[in-house]
């Protein structure tokens, strides 16, 4: 089976699952709703703007994590992965194809959520200026698809390693919401090194220009390169482990 055929097969599998449309539909609905609500009800003392619009995509990131990890664990639970394995004798080609499709789909969702969030906010609060007006705001808006693609592949890799839907989602959420903030708050406890900026999700936040986070050494764009490298390494480990578990 050619690489193109592998990609087409992965797309077909996703389209054939009712859960795909439901999960992505719920993600879009929740994200766009949050964008509209946030821009109408900004935090006390703050003026509504693009940062409120991006509340929706920021929350949607966690739903994309669930979707991407489930795309891996569901196949092992239902056994459809073995049908694909018969057609594609290489775990590397098969899983790289899956990762590629998931990344593209997540990026497309990012485009929809970012553009849709601005559109919904413009309707919900027409007197609020939500159009990006500077370099930082444009970066905050345009990095949404990239961030969702990276998070999706990282979540897929964790799902391949654990194979359990519940365990994978738990690990991802605890990692992003508990472990990284806790380690960042402890400061330079590890041999005098502040490890907070080196946490993947925190580094990704710096790339996106989110306020209140940590600054990655070398700047936000290097942070993106770092997160991409971590994601690629984790995916490579997941593929290697899968090849050893079931050659």
Segments the model singles out, each with a brief description of its role:
Residues 90-91:
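Short coil/turn motifs that cap or connect alpha-helices
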Residues 102, 186-195:
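A cytosolic-side transmembrane-helix exit/cap motif
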Residues 13, 73, 84-86, 155, ...:
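Helix-capping/transition residues at the boundaries of transmembrane alpha-helices
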Residues 237-247:
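Membrane-interface capping segments at transmembrane-helix boundaries
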Residues 1-11:
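Short, Lys/Arg-rich, polar N-terminal cytosolic tail immediately upstream
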Residues 47-49, 68-87:
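Transmembrane helix boundary and interhelical loop/hinge segments in multi-pass membrane proteins
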Residues 5, 18-70, 95-163, 174-185, ...:
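Secretory targeting signals
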